Every structure is written in structure tokens, then in C-alpha cells.
């Protein structure tokens, strides 16, 4: 069995190496047991990831290298985000003699994309800082996700039934038709999530520094919200029973130090309350919509 896995891995690597020469392509990753739930862990240092749930029984991965100066189809209004982090320069300086004048760049650097599957756990990873990638992944709807990207790319997810952990740094997070729970964090970009159904008794968390947090929940939602924004408004389509929060008194038993903390969080209950949903923003609004 081990020998068979090694052979499969070698063939898979050869296939990818050949395909990468074209800078774009796709391949199918079979699951160990298509009838069981799966988990996807996907990470890019530089680029965007789109994930779509479907009735399929395997995982389809499409990849494309975004050339320098080429716009990603998922790029948003650049005025809403900070300037992307600088790329690592992999090109040789041609100097002022113009020795490369008239030549076309065919490729530079490596795509560095690794894909593995073990017992329905699929891992898609690229640690490249010099080549921007666009990944499109189609998989069974019943998957748990751990997805992250760092620089100049958005995370777009749809039609998933499971637990989602979504992390970005310089880009947006957009998830729709979600049944389950979500923990979403980005630094420079908005967060927009639409739920068809939420997992009962499961806390959630949403956080960004620069951009709106826009969440849509079913009308039957029962939750306790803990919300905070420094430079924005909090808006709700639900009737929310507000919870008063006064100064919090604390005393360190070891040092004897006594202090009073003013709680700046806004707290409220929907439909009698439930698990805590923490929503933190700095420069943007918090919007809670009723579906």
C-alpha cells in the first residue's frame, strides 16, 4: 500500500510539473472515502482563492498564475484597500545597456503549488511570494474549511455546509449560502457572510481593521452579540435586546492592585440570546441583516 501511495505521488508530481509550464490548468484529487465528510486546508502567500461546494464526490483544483500587470478577475475597487505589500523581486537587473531590449519574458520564479490528500483531508498550499496565483476549488458541500491568504487576494466561498475558519490579511472575505459556523479574520478588507443556517450552540467571531463587516442570518437565529467598532456604526435588521454593561471592577489578589475597566463593547440578544458572536472592527461599519 505504501509503495502504491509513493507511485501515485510521483505521477501526481510529474503531472503538475508538466502542467505548470503552461501557467494554468486543472486536476482532480480523489477522496479516500467519498461518502464521508472531508476537510480542506488551503493557503497562499500571494493570490486569491475561490471555493465552491457542489454535488461532486472529489475535489477539482483549477490554478492560474497571474502575470505582472495582469488584473485578477476578483479584484475589487483598489481605493478600498491599502497598497499591496511589495513583491519580492526575482528578475535580474538588466542595467542601462539595454541588453534585454526587445526580449519577451516567458517565465520567472516557480509556481510552488503542493496538493496532498490523506483520509479525506485535502491540503493545497503555495509558499511563493514572487508569483501571484488564482485558485478555484470545487468540492463536496459537506466539507470543513481552513482557508488563508496573505497578500493581494480575496477569499470567496459559496455553498458550504461545515465549520469555516477563514483568514486574510490584505483582501476581502466573501462567503454566501453557508450552513454551519464561521470564524473570519482579515486586516485590510471587508467581511461579508450570508448564512442559510447556523450551527446551534456554536460561537462565532468576525474581525477586521479596515472595512465593513456585513452579516446576514436566518430570522430564527438565537445568539448573543458582542460588537465593537472605533470609527463606524452598528446597524441591525433584528430586534435586539440590549445588555447594559457598566464599569468592570478588578483586583489582583497577589499585588493588591485595584482597577476599573470601562467596557466599550455593545452587547445584545436576538430571540432570547444564545452562543456569543464576537464582531470587532476599527475603521468600518458592523451590519447585521435578517434573511
Name these PLM-found stretches.
Residues 47, 195, 213, 284:
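Extended lipid/amphipathic-ligand handling interfaces
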Residues 1-27:
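Bacterial Sec-dependent N-terminal signal peptides
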Residues 21-44, 48-148, 165, 182-183, ...:
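Acidic (Asp/Glu) and glycine-rich low-complexity loops/linkers
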Residues 49, 191, 234-235, 286-288:
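Short loop/beta submotifs within extracellular cysteine-rich repeat domains
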Residues 215-216, 236-237, 287-291:
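Extended hydrophobic-aromatic, low-complexity segments
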Residues 276-291:
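Short, low-complexity, Pro/Ser/Thr/Gly-rich segments in the mature regions of secreted, periplasmic
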Residues 130, 138-203, 207-210, 216-221, ...:
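Extended beta-solenoid/beta-helix repeat architectures
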Amino acid at each position: 500500500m505504501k509503495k502504491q501511495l509513493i507511485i501515485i505521488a510521483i505521477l501526481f508530481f510529474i503531472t503538475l510539473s508538466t502542467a505548470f509550464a503552461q501557467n494554468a490548468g486543472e486536476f482532480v484529487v480523489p477522496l479516500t472515502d467519498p461518502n464521508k465528510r472531508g476537510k480542506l486546508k488551503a493557503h497562499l502567500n500571494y493570490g486569491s482563492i475561490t471555493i465552491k461546494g457542489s454535488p461532486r464526490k472529489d475535489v477539482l483544483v483549477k490554478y492560474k498564475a497571474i502575470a505582472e500587470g495582469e488584473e485578477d478577475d476578483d479584484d475589487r475597487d483598489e481605493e478600498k484597500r491599502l497598497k499591496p505589500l511589495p513583491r519580492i523581486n526575482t528578475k535580474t537587473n538588466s542595467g542601462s545597456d539595454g541588453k534585454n531590449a526587445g526580449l519577451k519574458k516567458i517565465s520567472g520564479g516557480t509556481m510552488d503549488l503542493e496538493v496532498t490528500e490523506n483520509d479525506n483531508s485535502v491540503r493545497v498550499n503555495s509558499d511563493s511570494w514572487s508569483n501571484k496565483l488564482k485558485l478555484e476549488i470545487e468540492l463536496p458541500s459537506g466539507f470543513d474549511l481552513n482557508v488563508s491568504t496573505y497578500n493581494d487576494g480575496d477569499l470567496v466561498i459559496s455553498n458550504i455546509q461545515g465549520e469555516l475558519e477563514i483568514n486574510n490579511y490584505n483582501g476581502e472575505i466573501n462567503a454566501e449560502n453557508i450552513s454551519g459556523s464561521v470564524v473570519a479574520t482579515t486586516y485590510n478588507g471587508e467581511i461579508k457572510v450570508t448564512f442559510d443556517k447556523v450551527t446551534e450552540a456554536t460561537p462565532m467571531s468576525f474581525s477586521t481593521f479596515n472595512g465593513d463587516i456585513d452579516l446576514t442570518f436566518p430570522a430564527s437565529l438565537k445568539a448573543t452579540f458582542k460588537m465593537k467598532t472605533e470609527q463606524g456604526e452598528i446597524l441591525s435588521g433584528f430586534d435586539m435586546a440590549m445588555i447594559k454593561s457598566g464599569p468592570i471592577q478588578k483586583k489582583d489578589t497577589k499585588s493588591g492592585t485595584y482597577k476599573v475597566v470601562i467596557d466599550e463593547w455593545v452587547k445584545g440578544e436576538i430571540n432570547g440570546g444564545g452562543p456569543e458572536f464576537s464582531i470587532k472592527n476599527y475603521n468600518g461599519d458592523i451590519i447585521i441583516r435578517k434573511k
